[in-house]
């Protein structure tokens, strides 16, 4: 890869964005950011607390500011939150400022990966988490597809294998 272009990872919760993003950044010698972690750092609070106090709208406003800021950096790998694509502004920034990789996963795999995770505000206190994930997929999957330059399924691969696949695809990407 001659010049280091930004790589932005999008996809649903449990797709492996953070794990794959760290691996990718390490292999490419690029700086890694996780937008949810940056939001928590700046707020001095966990995302679940932000959701409780400010609601999803308050969180999404914070997310827009952070996405705008981080996507202006050069040569980074950015793992985004699952709902990042709900904002047209975020989709525009991601599309214009880097290569967007959509990490696809099935609802079954998402459920398996997130069922014991207490840091998923949209899944807290719900009767049927699988149904919530299915509902989110109906709304968000078309938006991930809209913004993606590259789409990869993540269900059966390790983070290292996924990172290598992304590197190969980006080396051949001329968008």
Swiss-Prot record:
Domain of life where this protein originates: Bacteria
GO cellular component: cytosol
Any one Gene Ontology molecular-function term assigned to this protein's record: shikimate kinase activity
InterPro entries reported in the protein's UniProt record: P-loop_NTPase, Shikimate/glucono_kinase, Shikimate_kinase/TSH1, Shikimate_kinase_CS
Catalytic activity: shikimate + ATP = 3-phosphoshikimate + ADP + H(+)
Cofactor binding annotation: Binds 1 Mg(2+) ion per subunit.
Signal peptide segment: none
Sequence similarity: Belongs to the shikimate kinase family.
Protein name per the record: Shikimate kinase
Species of origin: Actinobacillus succinogenes (strain ATCC 55618 / DSM 22257 / CCUG 43843 / 130Z)
Taxonomic lineage: Bacteria, Pseudomonadati, Pseudomonadota, Gammaproteobacteria, Pasteurellales
């Amino acid at each position: 890869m001659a010049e280091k272009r930004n790589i932005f990872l999008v996809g649903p919760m449990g797709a492996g964005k953070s794990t794959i993003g760290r691996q990718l950044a390490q292999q490419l010698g690029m700086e890694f950011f996780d937008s949810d972690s940056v939001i928590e750092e700046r707020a001095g609070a966990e995302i679940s607390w932000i959701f409780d106090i400010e609601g999803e709208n308050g969180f999404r406003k914070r997310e827009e500011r952070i996405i705008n800021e981080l996507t202006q950096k050069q040569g980074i790998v950015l793992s985004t939150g699952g709902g990042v694509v709900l904002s047209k502004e975020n989709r525009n920034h991601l599309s214009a400022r880097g290569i967007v990789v959509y990490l696809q996963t099935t609802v079954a795999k998402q459920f398996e990966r997130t069922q014991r995770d207490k840091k998923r505000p949209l899944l807290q206190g719900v009767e049927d988490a699988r149904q919530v994930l299915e509902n989110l997929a109906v709304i968000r999957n078309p938006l991930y597809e809209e913004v993606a330059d590259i789409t990869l399924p993540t269900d059966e691969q390790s983070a290292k294998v996924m990172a290598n696949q992304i590197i190969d695809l980006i080396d051949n990407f001329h968008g």
